[in-house]
Curated annotation (Swiss-Prot):
Subcellular location(s) per record: Secreted, Cell wall, S-layer
UniProt entry keywords in alphabetical sequence: Cell wall, Repeat, S-layer, Secreted, Signal
Keyword Repeat: yes
Superkingdom, natural source: Bacteria
Residue stretches making up the SLH domain: 54-117, 118-181, 182-231
The protein, known as: Surface layer protein
Residues annotated as signal peptide: 1-53
PROSITE patterns, sorted: SLH
GO terms for cellular component: extracellular region; S-layer
Protein's UniProt keywords contain Repeat: yes
Length: 1116
């Protein structure tokens, strides 16, 4: 079957702390969401220097990223040198002598300072002072003038007024200054944008402030005096300190906007080290600057502090130092070019999502009709035939090949989009920053977590004990580059617990790019949310982090590292635990560290399926339900099963008590509904011990002293207000089990089984007067140990309906978030569960987007045992098993449903919805002001109503008065059907659902070999074959599964849909993966429902019940 295309992304899958970044000319604009990826860090757009605003404070400015770039730029220009260890003293004050030195260098007079060393001008400047020549030159150029006493006071800390005065003089603007010093100079400095908002001009200035002022002055146009005497004439030239004195070629926005130039003529970055390693060194970049008179594809060195990889595919502003090997000392993006950093959501051709067929036929002529949709901003951008595409640092000559590869990988990878003047994509760079444990040479290695780094041997050892040794014979800077948190680094800078991935420059298997990040979140887990098996989230410190299904974890300081492997129980048990989360560049959890074992609890449990001895493993296998409502299959050696005295059942144990029963007999479910002391003592209460993997490693049979009570006596004995049963206290550790289901006793080799076991709240059990109850007590503590409800019903309230949004864990209790009706509105509510979430997620396969019927107990908790899936899957899909499926008609009463209608909306008029059925008939149905409208396929939220062309499911609740519909669920729309290429058959199958009891029809023909069919409603079923024997007196059925099955306890029912009469079934058998059976002769003009229950896999685990709709069509 054709793939339906780029999957529509769930917009709410983005982590809350993420953001979408839009950039124009280096200025970051934070929009809706964040993209913390290798792309956003390694290729991030640099921030343009901001005009400095000094504050009235004595706190030194911090050496932030912007200041660091300023200082690196001044260093590259030869203006500042620092202390040789990367420290430029930005947090220190600066003297008058030091500042005079900076100004002389900025005027290009450093060589003259050497000659002026002995031309002393001031009384306090000696020729032996290191700064003497600079002060003397500054004095000669009238940049400094000293004090009336002929001193210079070189060691005084320079004030803003003094510094701005020297700068204004150096720029030639002193003749234009009018007024009294220092205000006159401060005013002129502000006019020239040297600095703004200085509150205290007499306060000493830190070096960072001075550096910023000097940096701002570099691009100010110089003034020169062309007439002297009484007729003074001044002229502002086209020269600056950069161009006239420092010999710098300037190609920036000022240049682009003067002399008829424009920003399109700025140089284009055509190659960077992260892509062209081998042809480029780590500190080089290639520019196409033909229109800027810089030549075509010229390679330049870049000064320290410039990351050229940030500008690949962009127009850039540059300052090039002409007398130093053409070194670029400053680089920023063009202010007239839009750059978007986001994530890929989908690709479209002429409005339709990419599919296998579209990609197969895609050609370069189609590119003008291709759009790429962003996941964060939800905006789309059109490609052109000239769009350049890079994927994982590999350039593609043919953009069609690139798009095919990106579509095949199909994920929300990080993306950098450079737009042209028409808002079309000029350049596209996409990076897979989310795949973990990948190892494809020439594509990607990782992500991994570092355990040990050996920089000398160039070897990285990972937490999982694997090693990356490919760098051993390579030269750093030539054969491989290292980036840490997006900035160029050295291999020796990496540390234990860094998360890293390795890419390959332009796909070259011998050129490596090591990208590492050091992003850690630590603290107590406040909440655990599970939307599905691949979408699990932890909230720590108020921020929510998504956990990779294959993330690793350790409970003992990384001595033992294991995989999460989508173990929802494992993650749920992190609730309330202190954790350390190692995040990858996209902000997702790559590794989890805990201080203690994730689950060291010992819950109480009852047996729901009796023990059997497994001779092949020498274990006793049985099933229990814990007090949390979790069903657990147990398989233990007898030495791991203990009696009430703490003595195990090992055969060699000579301490075994003679009166202890055989284990198979002992470990059977027992339900006694009358007051019988003998029988009551047979009820087994267990204490179950879980290991660090969440598996049962020990079970203890408890010494339970059971008491019996029933009906009104129980109602008086149990007090929900005081939490007592008679004289015994009910605590938060008291287990309450519902054991009202059918019990099949153990007979011979057949195991006993308790159906529909569950858990309940004491408050619900205590207020009922129609129950039969056993309870066990701890006499020493005066507490109720466990309560067993063996007869009675009605522990829940009215049925409600809603769409599952996600699962979670809070305060050590599983939760479920449901979009549901709340009065006259629709809201998103988080409910606590009275049992285990796995009973819904795993046993019933209820997932995000599914619609359920549920009831609440007196504590407002969802009663797990009462949850019924009403609509499975939240959209119409070409694959039947993935398309919206309704619950069987005969189960709707149990779910509290009076009516269930499926149709396409033909017309909406107020509270009247006209529905167009598949056969063309139209019928009107009515809603009301309180009707809940829920979008279950796209927004996953409440909406105001429905529109023409919507595909809907309407529910009338039996527990809400009136005949108008109470819930309307939108599962698709005409627009969605079109863009996602949904077939007419899939739509027709959906519209036919009200007349079906299941999701798939088998069509049988009068051929002797039978007819294969595709997947039915359960994904475990692969196909089925109906064959017609020669005598035509019976029908042979074969149902094939994708796993080995056991039909020993299975029941097969074949029912005539019209008469609801059952057909005789015989010879039910299993051969590996195939279930076969025979029926009596069937009427080929009728339709039949086949129901298979009680199937198990080869390990004895229950397989979901199967319902098939069989239609006989002659001649097929």
């Amino acid at each position: 079957m054709q793939d339906s295309g780029f999957k529509k992304k769930d917009r709410s899958t983005n982590i809350p702390q993420e953001q979408f970044v839009y950039t124009r000319g280096g200025e970051h604009k934070v929009m809706k969401k964040v993209v913390n990826s290798v792309l956003a860090s390694a290729l991030a757009i640099t921030v343009a220097p901001m005009a400095f605003a000094a504050e009235d404070t004595t706190t030194a400015p911090k050496m932030d990223a912007a200041m660091e770039k300023t200082v690196k730029r001044l260093e590259a220009l030869g203006l500042v040198a620092g202390y040789g260890n990367g420290d430029f003293g930005a947090d220190k004050t600066i003297t008058r002598a030091e500042f005079a030195t900076l100004i002389v260098r900025a005027r290009g007079l450093e060589q003259g300072a050497k000659l002026a060393q002995f031309n002393t001008t001031y009384t306090d400047v000696r020729s032996t002072d290191w700064f003497a020549g600079f002060v003397n030159v500054a004095s000669g150029e009238e940049i400094v003038k000293g004090f009336p006493d002929k001193s210079f006071k070189p060691q005084n800390q320079v004030t803003y007024a003094e510094a701005v005065t020297m700068i204004v003089r150096a720029l030639g603007y002193e003749p234009s200054v009018r007024g009294v010093w220092p205000n006159s100079m401060i005013s002129k400095g502000s006019e020239l944008n040297i600095a703004k908002g200085i509150n205290n001009p007499n306060m000493q200035q830190f070096a960072a402030t001075i550096f910023k002022m000097l940096d701002n002055a570099l691009r100010v146009k110089l003034m020169e005096q062309i007439e002297y005497g009484t007729d003074i004439r001044l002229n502002v030239t086209d020269e600056t300190l950069l161009t006239k004195y420092l010999k710098v070629t300037v190609r920036d926005m000022d240049w682009a906007h003067e002399k008829g130039n424009n920003s399109d003529e700025l140089p284009l970055v055509t190659n960077v080290p992260a892509i062209g390693l081998g042809s480029l060194k780590a500190n080089e970049v290639t520019l196409n600057g033909k229109d800027a008179d810089l030549g075509s594809n010229t390679t330049y060195k870049v000064a320290e502090g410039i990351n050229p990889n940030a500008f690949d595919g962009q127009k850039v502003q540059v300052w090039i130092k002409d007398d130093r090997e053409n070194v670029i000392v400053w680089m920023e993006g063009s202010e007239d070019e839009d750059v978007v950093m986001d994530r890929v959501s989908a690709l479209y051709l002429k409005g339709k999502a990419f599919t296998d067929d579209i990609v197969k036929d895609l050609s370069k002529s189609d590119l003008d009709d291709v759009k790429i949709e962003m996941d964060g901003s939800e905006k789309s951008y059109r490609l052109t035939e000239d769009t350049k595409i890079t994927y994982n640092f590999t350039r593609f000559n043919d953009p069609v090949d690139a798009l095919s590869k990106i579509y095949k990988d199909n994920d929300t990878f990080g993306v950098k989009v450079v737009l042209n003047d028409n808002n079309e994509v000029a350049y596209l760079h996409i990076i897979d920053d989310q795949t973990i444990d990948k190892s494809v040479k020439g594509v990607k290695y990782g992500s991994k977590v570092i355990s040990k780094i050996d920089a000398d041997k160039k070897k990285i050892t990972n937490l999982d004990n694997s090693k990356f040794s490919d760098l051993e014979d390579q030269d750093e800077g030539k054969d491989f580059l290292v980036f840490l948190d997006g900035q160029p680094a050295k291999l020796g800078d990496l540390k234990e617990s860094d998360v890293y991935s390795v890419y390959y420059a332009d796909g070259d298997k011998d050129k490596y790019l090591v990208f590492a990040n050091r992003n850690v979140a630590e603290g107590k887990v406040e909440k655990v949310v599970s939307r599905n098996k691949t979408d699990i989230r932890l909230t720590v410190g108020g921020k929510t982090y998504k956990v990779y299904p294959d993330a690793s974890y350790s409970e003992n300081a990384n001595k033992d590292v294991k995989k999460v492997n989508s173990d929802l129980d494992l993650i749920s048990n992190l609730d309330g635990e202190e954790v350390k989360l190692l995040l990858d560049p996209s902000g997702r959890v790559r590794h989890i560290e805990t201080k203690d074992a994730i689950d060291d609890r010992k819950p109480l449990a009852i047996i729901t399926k009796g023990a059997t001895y497994n001779s092949s493993k020498d274990t006793y296998d049985f099933t229990v339900m814990t007090q949390k409502g979790k069903t657990q299959i147990v398989s233990l050696d007898q030495k791991d099963i203990y009696d009430r005295y703490g003595v195990n059942y090992d055969k060699s144990n000579d301490k075994r008590q003679a009166f202890e029963k055989d284990l198979v007999e002992l470990l059977q479910p027992k339900v006694v509904k009358e007051d019988s002391a003998t029988d009551a003592n047979q009820t087994v209460l267990l204490e179950v011990n879980f290991d660090s993997k969440g598996e049962v490693d020990k079970v203890k049979v408890l010494d339970s002293k059971l008491k019996y009570s029933e009906k009104s006596t129980w109602d008086k004995l149990a007090d929900e207000d005081d939490d007592v049963v008679g004289d015994y206290e009910v605590t938060d550790k008291t287990a309450v089990f519902k054991m009202t289901g059918d019990l099949t006793p153990a007979t011979g080799t057949k195991r006993g089984e308790l159906k529909n076991a569950g858990t309940a709240k004491f408050k619900d059990v205590a207020k009922k007067s129609d129950l039969k109850v056993w309870y066990s007590v701890d006499e020493d503590k005066g507490e109720v140990q466990a309560i067993f409800v063996v007869d009675g019903s009605g522990l829940g309230g009215d049925h409600q309906f809603g769409m599952v949004k996600q699962y979670g864990t809070a305060s050590k209790q599983d939760t479920i978030t449901i979009v549901t009706k709340d009065g006259d509105s629709v809201t998103e509510k988080e409910y606590k569960l009275d049992g285990d979430a796995d009973d819904l997620k795993v046993d019933q396969d209820i997932r995000r987007g599914d619609v359920i019927s549920f009831t609440l107990n007196s504590d407002g908790e969802v009663i797990v045992d009462d949850v019924v899936e009403v609509v499975n899957n939240n959209h119409i899909d070409n694959t039947a098993s993935k398309s919206a499926t309704l619950m069987p008609e005969d189960e709707r009463q149990k779910a509290g449903i009076d009516k269930l209608v499926v149709a396409r909306v033909d017309e909406v008029d107020g509270n009247t919805i006209s529905l167009n059925y598949a056969d063309g008939k139209t019928q009107k149905y009515y809603t009301k002001a309180s009707t809940a409208f829920i979008d279950v396929y796209d927004g996953l939220e409440g909406i105001d109503g429905v529109d023409e062309g919507d595909y809907i499911v309407m529910i009338d609740s039996a527990d809400i008065d009136g005949t108008r519909f109470d819930y309307v669920l939108v599962v698709s729309s005409d627009d969605e059907i079109r863009t996602q290429h949904i077939s007419t058959k899939a739509v027709t199958d959906f519209l036919n659902k009200p007349t079906r009891l299941c999701t798939k029809s088998w069509r049988w023909g009068r051929s002797s070999h039978g007819t294969k069919v595709n997947t039915v409603n359960d994904e475990a079923v692969v196909d089925g074959i109906v064959t017609l024997p020669a005598d035509a007196s019976v029908r042979n059925f074969n149902i094939a599964f994708d796993q080995e099955i056991n039909s020993k306890d299975a029941t097969v029912t074949v029912t005539n849909e019209d008469t609801l009469g059952n057909v005789t079934v015989s010879e039910v058998a299993t051969d590996a993966k195939v279930l076969s059976f025979k029926t009596a002769k069937l009427d080929t003009t009728k339709t039949y429902i086949i129901t298979v229950k009680g199937l198990k896999d080869k390990n004895g685990k229950a397989v979901k019940d199967v319902t098939l709709y069989v239609e006989f069509v002659a001649g097929v």
